[in-house]
Regions:
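N-terminal amphipathic/basic-hydrophobic helices that include classical n-h-c signal peptides
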Residues: 1-23
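N-terminal domain-start signal
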Residues: 16-374
Length: 374
């Protein structure tokens, strides 16, 4: 019981570090440091790996790819994991550790209400780690496997999550151990005895986007940020509908799983939930004047041919990235350069992870480049 309380205390402290650290870093004055933060974010973005350098990495052999990545800003984290891991595992652990460090740095140089807005994009990684813990516990992964591979103990930001893993045996015990945090409070609303992993993940998504919309309408925000988040909700709902259809989930269940707050109306999403084919989903979406159908016919055809939703997901991702890039350029002194930097940093991590894993299994440079997002 005492250990359980300590874990809860750590989780609450972890959450407060993300959400309320601004009180120590400028919110007391009630002012955001938008000019300084946007300038620093732009400087960081300029230091990211550009497409030319990424394509050069594509030509690197699998035996030297780790060293090459280390020289591009990941050396400190690579050194941490090289003693215990090797190859793609070491590189991947280093990449995620570097991302955690980078997100912490970004939060530290944001102040005032700006910090709360940026926290929206940092918090999503805490939500993802909560999902990771729930999946690992539900899947019966051993503590040793989780600590060595999934959430490496070398990363201090994994400590609170590893405590949950070590002290819980079931999915519901893991969910209960998160009480006191926004994600834990949302999980507590579910039927403790019957809630499935899928229902818990859906609940976390709803909580995240509900909070994101609330914060995005506050001080130092703008209508374009609200539009971006609502677009992201739409994209999540669209890809979920295609996925749920493939899984033969009932119409009622599909409608229940829709995340509220998007630009697509409830009526349209109700019609989408009743669709019984990819084509009919698209037809229902076309009834909304906020839906851009450009490229969807081709993406669905490719998806059907390949038996995967990757073409549709890629189309939506590119749309969202283009929208964020546009908002960042149109609003050079705002929250957008900071958010755009975070997005580009995450894409760099994803590209490097794909590169390392792909090289390990012998994928060609052409195949890897086709799946990268520059």
């Amino acid at each position: 019981m005492k250990r359980g309380k300590r874990i809860l205390e750590k989780l609450i402290i972890f959450y407060l570090v993300i959400r309320k650290g601004e009180k120590m870093l400028g919110q007391a004055s009630g002012r955001s440091n938008i000019c300084n933060a946007s300038a620093r974010a732009k400087a960081r973005k300029a230091s990211l790996i550009d497409p030319t350098r990424m394509r050069q990495l594509l030509q690197t052999g699998p035996e030297s790819i780790g060293a090459s990545i280390g020289e591009l800003g990941y050396r400190n984290e690579m050194d941490i994991y090289s003693a215990r891991m090797s190859g793609a595992d070491a590189v991947e652990a280093a990449l995620f550790h570097n991302l955690d460090n980078d997100l912490s740095d970004v939060m530290n140089f944001c102040q005032g209400p700006l910090k709360s807005i940026v926290a929206i994009y940092v918090e999503r990684f805490a939500y993802e780690k909560a999902k990771t813990v729930l999946r690992a516990v539900n899947g019966g992964c051993s503590d040793e496997l989780i600590e060595s591979q999934i959430l490496p103990s070398e990363n201090p930001m994994n400590a609170v999550w590893l405590d949950i893993v070590r002290t819980t045996e079931t999915l519901h015990e893991a969910a209960n151990s998160m009480a006191g945090t926004p994600w834990g409070k949302e999980l507590a609303k579910l039927d403790d005895s019957d809630a499935t992993l899928e229902e818990m993940e859906d609940a976390l998504d709803r909580q995240y986007y509900s909070h994101a919309l609330k914060v995005s309408k506050g001080r130092d925000s703008n209508p374009q940020l609200v539009k971006y988040i609502r677009t992201e909700i739409d994209h999540r709902n669209i890809i979920n509908q295609f996925r749920e259809l493939r899984q033969n989930i009932s119409t009622e269940k599909r409608l229940q799983m829709v995340i509220p707050g998007g630009r697509l109306s409830k009526t349209v999403m109700s019609q989408v939930s009743q669709a019984n084919s990819n084509k009919s989903i698209l037809e229902a979406l076309r009834r909304s004047n906020t839906f851009d159908e450009t490229g969807f016919d081709e993406a669905i055809l490719e998806s059907d041919a390949l038996g995967t939703l990757d073409p549709i997901a890629t189309l939506l991702n590119h749309r969202r990235h283009d929208l964020l890039r546009s908002f960042s350029y149109l609003n050079p002194v705002s929250v957008f350069p900071v958010i755009y930097y975070i997005e580009r940093k995450v894409l760099e991590i994803q590209n490097l992870r794909l590169l390392v894993r792909g090289k390990t299994i012998g994928l060609t440079a052409e195949v890897l480049e086709a799946h990268m997002d520059f």
